[in-house]
UniProtKB/Swiss-Prot annotation:
Keywords for this protein: Oxidoreductase, Pyridoxal phosphate
E.C. numbers: 1.4.4.2
Self-association and partners: The glycine cleavage system is composed of four proteins: P, T, L and H. In this organism, the P 'protein' is a heterodimer of two subunits.
Cofactor(s) required for function per UniProt: pyridoxal 5'-phosphate
Gene: gcvPB
Name of one Pfam family that matches: GDC-P
Protein name: Probable glycine dehydrogenase (decarboxylating) subunit 2
Length: 481
């Protein structure tokens, strides 16, 4: 029940009278024609309502959250604590650079940390989400070709195992998407790549490790072929958590990338924001980076604006990015340091391989059994579907009943009835074993009573929602009747 429905028409809480202001200068079409619909609740009732809702939330602070490709790692409280210091929290966006030197120094150091981590030479922290960073990266590729007069380069190559945002970003930037297949071993089909490379190629968008959870072994060959064709390589940083300190996109031949700080650098995840998706580039694309950036002149830190970067693709938003998120990322990086970030990647990889081996041991089917998991892996429940009629969705709903968030379902699309599982480095063996035992228990139930799975979840206030109705009849301005 939403708060509007609880006591409407029953209670009329008193409010302090307010003096009516002059509204004569407000256009008539901007004035309300009727009173707003507001919940009628006392303060205590409101507190109880939202406290009860919070207890129904599922989050990384309450339970294991192995959502593949999302890197649901713990957000350290120290980062929140120090990012909430008055000097950071109370800084006004219009404050002069001279008055916020401490904040700018943190951002400057974060830019340098990202350069070192990725093997790139230029960084902008301006994008306010991973998707916006992705847009900025492809926009820079387009700007690069246009400056060279290569206006015919309007094709972006995207593997079929790519993130769904990749083709969407290319489309938003006015480019055509050319899809190529992934082979049965998880690597890109090089022969298919050769067939689509040509004078219209603007670039290729890759995630490495890929969304099927394996490292692209032919990345050096791919980079050479794309560059020889005149294209550029875009690195989707969604899976960067798997390789920190072990491999760098710049060294693989990538020209531009975006990072998801809510994944790699453990900033708050989900809830609609705020987010941060920094972009990093090599020398080819530095002149196109979005502004503002933080620079250093003499011993002072400064904002670099359009006048300092004349070929920039421009601003992506008002002000200077989501600095509260960026500060949290800086603190996370400072706490771990280079060795700590490398260790985090090692443990993330170890955890993924442990879970993959254990589930294989328990008789589940691994999508790419001959490959090592980089940080996540895929279980296909196709045998369970064929033998018992239960689906990946049924397993997912039953997992929620057992206090474990479901892994990513049906993604990537090329693996049938799949669960994409990513434990991250912040989980211990007990948490992972709880998940494994839950999977075994659910399969045992499926053998005896598959209809039980069809009715799950049983322990939540909402059970199976009508996904089609929600998509077809979207209501984002709901009001009580």
């Amino acid at each position: 029940m939403v708060i509007f429905e609880k006591t409407r028409g029953k209670n009329s809480p008193s409010v302090m009278p307010s003096k009516k202001g002059d509204v004569s200068n407000i256009p008539a079409n901007m004035l309300r024609s009727k009173k707003p619909i507001l919940p009628e609740q006392a303060e205590l009732d409101v507190v109880r309502h939202y406290t009860q809702l919070s207890r129904k939330n599922f989050c990384i602070d309450t339970n294991f959250y192995p959502l593949g490709s999302c890197t649901m790692k713990y957000n350290p409280r120290a980062a929140h604590k120090y990012a909430s210091l008055a000097g950071f929290l109370e800084r006004h966006p219009y404050a002069s650079a001279q008055s916020v030197q401490g904040t700018l120094e943190c951002l400057y150091d974060l830019q340098n940390l990202i350069k070192e981590l990725t093997g790139m030479t230029g960084v902008s922290l301006a994008p306010m989400a991973g998707a916006q960073g992705e847009f900025a990266g492809v926009a820079m590729i387009k700007a690069y070709h246009h400056k060279r007069g290569d206006f015919e380069r309007d094709e972006i190559i995207v593997p079929d195992a790519a993130h769904g945002t990749n083709p969407a970003t290319a489309k938003v930037c006015g480019l055509k998407v050319i899809e190529i297949p992934t082979k049965k071993d998880g690597d890109i089909d090089i022969e298919a790549l050769d067939k689509v490379l040509g004078p219209k190629t603007a670039g290729i968008m890759l995630t490495n490790p890929s969304t099927v959870g394996v490292f692209e072994r032919n990345i050096a060959v791919i980079a050479k072929k794309v560059h020889e064709a005149g294209g550029l390589l875009y690195y989707d940083g969604a899976n960067l958590n798997a390789i920190m300190g072990k491999a760098r996109p710049g060294d693989m031949g990538f020209d531009v990338l975006h990072m998801n700080l809510h994944k790699t650098f453990a900033t708050p995840h989900g809830g609609g924001g705020p987010g941060a998706g920094p972009v990093a580039v090599n020398d080819k694309l530095k002149e196109f980076l979005p502004v503002p950036m933080v620079g250093k002149k003499a011993d002072k830190f400064v904002w670099l604006e359009e006048k300092d970067v004349p070929n920039t693709i421009g601003r992506l938003s008002a002000f200077n990015g989501n600095i509260g998120v960026l500060i949290r990322a800086y603190i996370y990086g400072a706490m771990l340091g280079g060795n700590g970030l490398t260790e985090a990647s090692k443990i993330a990889t170890l955890n993924a391989n442990y879970m993959m081996a254990r589930l294989k041991q328990e008789g589940f089917t691994i999508a790419y059994p001959e490959r090592r998991a980089s940080h996540e892996f895929i279980v296909t429940l196709k045998p369970e579907f064929q033998n018992y009629g239960v689906t990946a969705t049924d397993f997912a709903k039953c997992l929620i009943d057992r206090g474990v968030h479901a892994p990513t379902m049906y993604f990537p699309l090329l693996v049938p009835e799949c669960l994409l599982i990513e434990p991250t480095e912040t989980e211990n063996v007990d948490s992972m074993e709880k998940f494994i035992q839950a999977m075994v228990e659910i399969r045992d139930i499926a053998k005896k009573d598959p209809q039980y799975l069809k009715g799950a979840p049983y322990n939540l206030p909402a059970r199976r929602l009508d996904d089609v109705k929600a998509a077809k009849e979207l209501d984002i301005v709901w009001q009580p009747k």
